[in-house]
């Protein structure tokens, strides 16, 4: 449940948490993203503040948004004055955001459904890599879903049900794939991306996705980090940051199915460099 989740009651970010993201390293990251969004705003016809929305998926403590908002106050006052929607389910982080941005027009959402019907200018920084995935693994008799079982008092990975032929076709899994090949899918990521892509295709704007990812690779990318060190994925679940590499090709197909287009991906270093960070 949300109340029992990893982010529910603790601050997981920064040097005293489990991991550090780009906004905790330098405010330049947020400033560059703000400039990119301001450019996108101009390309979209420069809508007034009350005719658009700012959106962030997985804002954490609001560090990135604060840096972006500070920049917008200088370079794009319309974006600084626009209403903001944070997609955040953690009760703890929702409380932090409400307090931190009490002077702004902030809306907290648990899903990307029922957003205002206006152009959306959004960012998702290290958001999709934290959403749930499913894994399939190739065995001698075919593809099976990877499951989690209990060995005495320890969680362990085990083989689950075999994939139906329709599932193999849906996920483009080869029957002659090498033994122990692993394929990953994230229905949760595709559901959020589809909703945002549908919104952008209909009302305009765009969403900048910054994440660790891959393109059309089939391997096991599931990992866990606790206090800045790699740990076994099933070691003390709920107390470690579990993530995976985002499949940008899958997100691109999902966006295109909704009438939008995913541009990229490009390496983050190149993206930031071309926007001014050296």
State where each predicted segment sits.
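Class I S-adenosyl-L-methionine
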Residues: 116-278
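Rossmann-like AdoMet
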Residues: 1-57, 61-119, 270-278
């Amino acid at each position: 449940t949300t109340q029992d989740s990893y982010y529910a009651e603790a601050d997981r970010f920064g040097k005293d948490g489990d991991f550090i993201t780009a906004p905790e390293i330098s405010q330049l990251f947020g400033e560059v993203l703000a400039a990119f969004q301001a450019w996108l705003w101009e390309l979209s016809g420069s809508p007034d503040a009350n005719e658009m929305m700012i959106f962030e998926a997985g804002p954490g403590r609001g560090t990135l948004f604060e840096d972006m908002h500070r920049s917008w106050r200088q370079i794009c006052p319309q974006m600084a004055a626009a209403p903001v929607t944070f997609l955040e389910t953690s009760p703890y982080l929702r409380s932090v955001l409400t307090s931190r941005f009490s002077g702004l027009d902030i809306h907290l959402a648990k899903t990307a459904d029922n957003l205002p019907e206006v152009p959306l200018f959004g960012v998702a920084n290290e958001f999709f890599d934290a959403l749930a995935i499913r894994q399939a693994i190739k065995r001698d008799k075919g593809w099976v879903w990877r499951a989690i079982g209990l060995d005495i008092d320890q969680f362990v990975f085990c083989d689950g049900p075999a994939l139906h032929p329709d599932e193999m076709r849906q996920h483009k899994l080869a029957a002659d794939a090498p033994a122990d090949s692993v394929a990953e899918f994230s229905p949760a990521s595709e559901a959020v991306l589809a909703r945002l892509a549908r919104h952008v295709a209909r009302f305009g704007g765009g969403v900048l996705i910054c994440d660790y990812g891959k393109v059309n690779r089939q391997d096991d990318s599931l990992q866990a980090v606790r206090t800045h060190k790699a740990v076994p994925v099933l070691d003390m679940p709920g107390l470690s940051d579990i993530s995976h590499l985002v499949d940008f090709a899958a997100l691109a197909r999902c966006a295109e199915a909704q009438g939008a287009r995913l541009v990229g991906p490009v390496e983050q270093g190149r993206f930031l460099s071309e926007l001014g960070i050296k």
